[in-house]
Amino acid sequence: SEEETELNGQGPAIGAEAVAELFRKLDKLRDGDTIVLAGSIPSTMPSDTYEKILAHLKGKQIRTVVDATKDLLKNVLQYQPFLIKPNHYELGELFGVTLHSHSEIEAYARKLQEMGARNVLVSMAEQGALLLDEASICHICGVCQGTVKNSVGAGDSMLAGFLAGLETGDYTDALKLGTAAGGATTFSEGLAERAEIDRLLLQL
């Protein structure tokens, strides 16, 4: 079958003490570290938890990355996150529009930059990916070719690959590594493995 069924379970109940422990751990982060805030917030936690985390880290040299949607994403922009990663559908959803072309996606990515995001990484399904870096330079990467087996975790893999690639300081290489990592997960039964990532990099 070519159909894919995704089951999303309800998150655990997280109490106030666990949240307090989280913030104590945040104080152990050092300059140059990266923290990724991804997905939805459990219903037992305050809805502004992401905002509080970014406010807590404000003024420190820590890369804050947010992979979320709707108000969870929009409300953190005032804290100038280092990177946000909506897909093209989520980007359009923020502004109540449907985006199709690279130029449309770039235009709305720039709006997010104007609202505070330093770097905007947009996954565009079969169109590949677009990165608007903090120098306002737009980078576009095509999509890898292969047989889709599993799309679950592809966005997370792309983000992980991008951040790993960014250790070299080159946005273009980081975008390619992220694209290959996302593709490697999509074309496998599980998560991306290095050999498959390296193979797909040759396509980009």
Model-derived features with residue positions:
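Short, charged, surface-exposed secondary-structure boundary motifs
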Residues: 16-17, 93-99, 148-152
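Short, small-residue-enriched loops and turns at beta-alpha junctions
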Residues: 12-15, 41-45, 72-74, 128-129, ...
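Conserved beta-alpha-beta core of the PfkB/ribokinase-like small-molecule kinase fold
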Residues: 34-104
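A general structural detector for well-ordered alpha-helical segments in enzyme core domains, enriched
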Residues: 22-25, 49, 53, 108
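Conserved phosphate-binding/catalytic region of the ribokinase-like
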Residues: 56, 74, 102-204
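Conserved N-terminal subdomain of the carbohydrate kinase-like
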Residues: 1-34, 200-204
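Short, acidic/turn-prone active-site loops that include or flank metal/cofactor-
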Residues: 10-13, 70, 88-91, 143-147
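Short beta-strand segments
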Residues: 7-10, 37-38, 67, 123
